[in-house]
């Protein structure tokens, strides 16, 4: 634990804030959160640099942002003791620990009361009643309850507002990508074992220069420690708060990009609660060709992915209800060996289609795969023909309904077989769909593959599939398709 000095002045009913750091860490002359000003004063000049909030109309950030700004995020997530001076000249020691949810002031409630009073008066003047303004919780602490109990949720709300809502971040993607919070959470040491340190790029007050500084081992530990709180978008590199990410269907709040979903999340999204009945869960691969690998044996790799994902194979199959309509569904999981199709994956899908044929159920296949599994050689390639054969009987002979959903990525043997055999083929927005990957084509043919030529939007205009459907309305779209083809809910109380 380290001590840091904070000088705060409470005057005219408003909280003002200034941070002084040791010379080794640099100093900030303007209130933290102001990213448009500049200056280079030291602690001794604090009386000159502290201003009233009423004089800061030119600043772009909300007033409350001066208490904790993006540049001070390291202080928020550290286990530190702060020293604070109020307007009366009294000093207090504050212990702040996010992980343990502790916010303590040393045996004196006067400063805490004054601080709460300042926030309370400010929130009423700026936001009005909390019930009338949805931004209330983004910036303000809840003074009705214990600070110690709610400090964690307050920090959650603050970080979410800084990352997702503040206009000065969302309005400039260049500055956003280089912002302190972005690099703090996602920077990794390339040669950590050799150097023991990593570089962190910070954005300075003038928005024009980047300061390169070395983080110590403690900073790197914090980086890994809090990275689990965020999900980075593959498209815009924006940060999405993980606590709300699943409820958003893994769709980026910044740009609307559809990120990868696990098979379990997709089942939860598509199947009515309490109706899922999995099939062939105990079926596992056994290394049929004794694949030789100098790095990691095939069996060990399977065990590793089984522990990591909680799955036995790269596909989950079963039956359930979709808005009350009984369906057979198979969902591939890219997190398990890239969703590769081996003999077990092929067998589980084959059995699913045979079961649906006997029960006259519609079939949904959600594809997310890198293709055939190389560790099983020609046995994995045989699965293409086996699934296609049983699918032919299901569709052509039994006249039943098969819907294929292509997600990112869908490539290789899956694309060349059951992925493209659906009566209706649906793709997710921005999905990567191909037989051979871009790098393979370029290295094989020595030709450049145009950017975006394997994206769902481009392929849709070439007639490769029927429609592109976002995740939000997907369940209702499938329900309409099934009813159009004569599959109806089991009872009248089911959702249409």
Curated annotation (Swiss-Prot):
Keyword terms of this UniProt record: ATP-binding, Chloroplast, Fatty acid biosynthesis, Fatty acid metabolism, Lipid biosynthesis, Lipid metabolism, Metal-binding, Nucleotide-binding, Plastid, Transferase, Zinc, Zinc-finger
Record's subcellular location: Plastid, Chloroplast stroma
GO MF annotation, one: acetyl-CoA carboxylase activity
Gene Ontology biological process terms, A to Z: fatty acid biosynthetic process; malonyl-CoA biosynthetic process
Associated pathway: Lipid metabolism; malonyl-CoA biosynthesis; malonyl-CoA from acetyl-CoA: step 1/1
Required co-factors: Zn(2+)
InterPro entries assigned: AcCoA_carboxyl_beta (IPR034733), Acetyl_CoA_COase_Trfase_b_su (IPR000438), ClpP/crotonase-like_dom_sf (IPR029045), COA_CT_N (IPR011762)
Catalysed reactions, semicolon-separated: N(6)-carboxybiotinyl-L-lysyl-[protein] + acetyl-CoA = N(6)-biotinyl-L-lysyl-[protein] + malonyl-CoA
UniProt-listed Pfam families: Carboxyl_trans
Binding site for Zn(2+): 233, 236, 252, 255
Matching PROSITE patterns: COA_CT_NTER
Zinc finger (C4-type): 233-255
EC number of the protein: 2.1.3.15
Entry's family note: Belongs to the AccD/PCCB family.
Function recorded in the entry: Component of the acetyl coenzyme A carboxylase (ACC) complex. Biotin carboxylase (BC) catalyzes the carboxylation of biotin on its carrier protein (BCCP) and then the CO(2) group is transferred by the transcarboxylase to acetyl-CoA to form malonyl-CoA.
Name the UniProt record assigns to this protein: Acetyl-coenzyme A carboxylase carboxyl transferase subunit beta, chloroplastic
Naturally occurring in which organism (per UniProt): Piper cenocladum
């Amino acid at each position: 634990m380290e001590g840091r000095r904070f000088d705060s002045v409470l005057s005219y009913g408003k909280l003002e804030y200034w941070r002084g750091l040791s010379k080794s860490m640099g100093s900030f002359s303007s209130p933290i959160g102001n990213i448009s000003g500049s200056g280079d004063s030291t602690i001794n000049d604090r009386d000159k640099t502290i201003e009233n909030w009423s004089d800061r109309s030119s600043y772009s950030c909300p007033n409350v942002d001066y208490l904790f700004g993006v540049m001070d995020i390291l202080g928020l997530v550290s286990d530190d003791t702060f020293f604070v001076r109020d307007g009366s000249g009294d000093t207090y020691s504050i212990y702040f620990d996010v992980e343990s949810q502790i916010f303590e002031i040393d045996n004196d409630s006067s400063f805490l009361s004054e601080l709460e009073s300042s926030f309370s008066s400010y929130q009423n003047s700026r936001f009005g009643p909390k019930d009338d303004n949805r931004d209330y919780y983004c910036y303000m602490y809840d003074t009705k309850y214990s600070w110690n109990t709610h400090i964690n949720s307050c920090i959650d709300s603050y970080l979410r507002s800084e990352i997702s809502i503040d206009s000065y971040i969302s309005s400039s993607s260049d500055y956003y990508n280089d912002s302190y919070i972005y690099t703090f959470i996602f920077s990794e040491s390339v040669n950590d074992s050799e150097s023991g340190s990593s570089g962190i790029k910070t954005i300075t007050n003038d928005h024009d220069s980047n300061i390169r500084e070395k983080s110590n081992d403690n900073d790197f530990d914090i980086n890994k420690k809090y990275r689990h709180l965020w999900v980075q978008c593959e498209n815009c590199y924006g940060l999405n708060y993980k606590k709300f990410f699943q409820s958003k269907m893994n769709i980026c709040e910044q740009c609307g990009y559809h990120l990868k979903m696990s098979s379990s999340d997709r089942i939860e999204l598509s199947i009515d609660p309490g109706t899922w009945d999995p099939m062939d869960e105990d079926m596992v691969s056994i290394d049929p060709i004794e694949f030789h690998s100098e790095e990691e044996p095939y069996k060990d790799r399977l065990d590793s992915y089984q522990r990591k994902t909680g799955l036995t194979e790269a596909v989950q199959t079963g039956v359930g209800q979709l808005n009350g309509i009984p369906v057979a569904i198979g969902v591939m999981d890219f997190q398990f060996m890239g969703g590769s199709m081996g003999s077990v994956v092929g067998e589980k899908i084959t059995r699913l289609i045979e079961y649906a044929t006997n029960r006259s159920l519609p079939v949904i296949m959600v594809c997310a795969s890198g293709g055939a599994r190389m560790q099983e050689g020609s046995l994995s390639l045989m699965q293409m023909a086996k699934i296609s054969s049983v699918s032919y009987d299901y569709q052509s002979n039994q006249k039943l309904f098969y819907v294929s959903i292509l997600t990112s990525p869908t490539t290789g043997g899956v694309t060349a077989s059951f992925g493209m055999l659906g009566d209706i083929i649906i793709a997710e927005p921005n999905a990567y769909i191909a037989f051979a990957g871009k790098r393979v084509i370029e290295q094989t043919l020595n030709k450049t593959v145009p950017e975006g030529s394997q994206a769902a939007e481009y392929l849709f205009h070439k007639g490769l599939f029927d429609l592109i459907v976002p995740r939000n309305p997907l369940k209702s779209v499938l329900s309409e398709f099934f009813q159009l083809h004569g599959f109806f809910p089991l009872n009248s109380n089911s959702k249409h």
